[in-house]
């Protein structure tokens, strides 16, 4: 059996030795290992892929026995187990299309049991991929009720994380606190950058020379969550606002897809307001 273990705890001597001992004791063999100690917070993180003939329970028991004294946040799962993603969208399709395309190719190791939107425009696209589509229109009056409906679906479908693929609604503090570190958003700027409506028009008006996009975890502070992935492209004085929009869309879809892939492979560790990422 091929297993993946992730660990996070305060840095202290003996953690790596305990991990390797635990894997050896359950008949395991390490295939891949990455580790890092954050010098500021003294937090140790580790991602270890290993194989064992004794099964998941034996591995769990062995790791618990050897590592419990370090009081770690420890997770073990089969590498072929796919995390379950709920996608939220509005009207823009470029990020959603890319996620669905990569999902169909098998390049994203996730399951997508449902796509939810506050508009109806993307229903046909979603259902053409054999994925259920749920239309939940949002207004000032019903926003709280609709968020409760989404949270109910998250519980019902055992969703592991949420992807905001250009979902143009600000999630409430209550919603964000229900899934800390489990909601990924794509922001149309290389943060910090232009906020609000028409960011590419703002960028054009300021004569910027690079534009970009940022994928980050959602918190109750708008667009201030820990950054997962970023990318940029160079532009010039001859680039129109429409040029910037087209270039920006391409960056957005790539950055969001990379963030989803990193999350699905348990490569992201949250340490305060920062992320540690094993590529």
Predicted segment positions?
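Short glycine-/aliphatic-rich beta-strand segments at the starts of folded cytosolic domains
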Residues: 1-10
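One-carbon transfer enzymes
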Residues: 36-279
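N-terminal short leaders/motifs
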Residues: 1-2, 26-35, 40
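Short amphipathic alpha-helix segments
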Residues: 12-32
